């Protein structure tokens, strides 16, 4: 029984050493060449300000004041016996002891104390039982480098020695172990950021390069070098060093934007921002194509000379240019115009009222007499119409007498004396009206 358990452990170690890189996620770029993560085209004008943005949160440098507690490994059990559960088994920091969460697992599960020196984070489980089967997860966290890696191992328990085996299912290692035996769940990572503690501040560097138009990348000019330790190097002339600048707090914020306060035509070219974190395995490059053009000229109206008038070409048809000028009216002018309108409207109403009154009065009096003649006293029309003496007297005056000759007729007319009579024309008109 013990011999078979030892043989099983040897098989697990051999299988893990042969297949560890099949399921381990690489923590860093083994290729020292920078990876181009972005390409940006920038077009601007002469005199503008230029901002070439280059940011990365992984380049933020924080001093390790907790004695390298920025690396941690922990093992979790995700499911057991077909029932989902998330259970933390143990964890261990690079500068501390390992912590086991359940008393049941004390002295039964463990991780090598030299895991952060040799890179072996495998979990050893003694006297396995049916409650131990499930999906195990080995989690590595590097808070300084912002790295997270996970390795999963499936553990199944059997009571038959013939079913004991180890195989790869395409996603993870599957181990079928015999009950009450000792099992090793493999998890290894030998990258230097998990095994060694270098001087991180000496391995973080950022530099800016510039290529003039037509210059290849390998002949680019270096502008600025910056280190996390605070050292800074600027290249080129004093004017160029003062003109192009990066913030002094770049490593504390992860912002390495290049600022150019006043752009000229000579600033055109290709700019490259290189970010290198050798400890964390970060190598990135961002490319900027900067083009600077002159500002468009605004045409000013030409001044005409009144003394010398240009010759008029008869073949050219002159266009009449009309300029509309709008003057904003004041509030006082508005009230003045409103007063004019109201006064005119009031005068019109008065005239209309006078005409209506005169027309009605004229209709009552009639249209047969003159309005300008003074009015007489009112006379009853029935009395006038029923006065027979006047009518008789009027008829008597119309009588004709036959005379023998004309001489006697003339004498008779001359001898006739008519009594004076007052005639009221207004009364006569009313008589005629009564007839």
UniProtKB/Swiss-Prot annotation:
The keyword Chaperone does not apply. Residues 1-22 form the signal peptide. InterPro entries: Ig-like_dom (IPR007110), Ig-like_dom_sf (IPR036179), Ig-like_fold (IPR013783), Ig_sub (IPR003599), Ig_V-set (IPR013106), MXRA8 (IPR042472). SUPFAM superfamilies: Immunoglobulin (SSF48726). It is found in: Cell membrane. GO terms for cellular component: cell surface; plasma membrane. Keywords: Cell adhesion, Cell membrane, Disulfide bond, Glycoprotein, Immunoglobulin domain, Membrane, Repeat, Signal, Transmembrane, Transmembrane helix. One of its GO terms (biological process) is cell differentiation. Homodimer in cis. Does not appear to form trans-homodimers. This is Matrix remodeling-associated protein 8. It comes from Xenopus laevis (African clawed frog). The lineage of its organism: Eukaryota, Metazoa, Chordata, Craniata, Vertebrata.
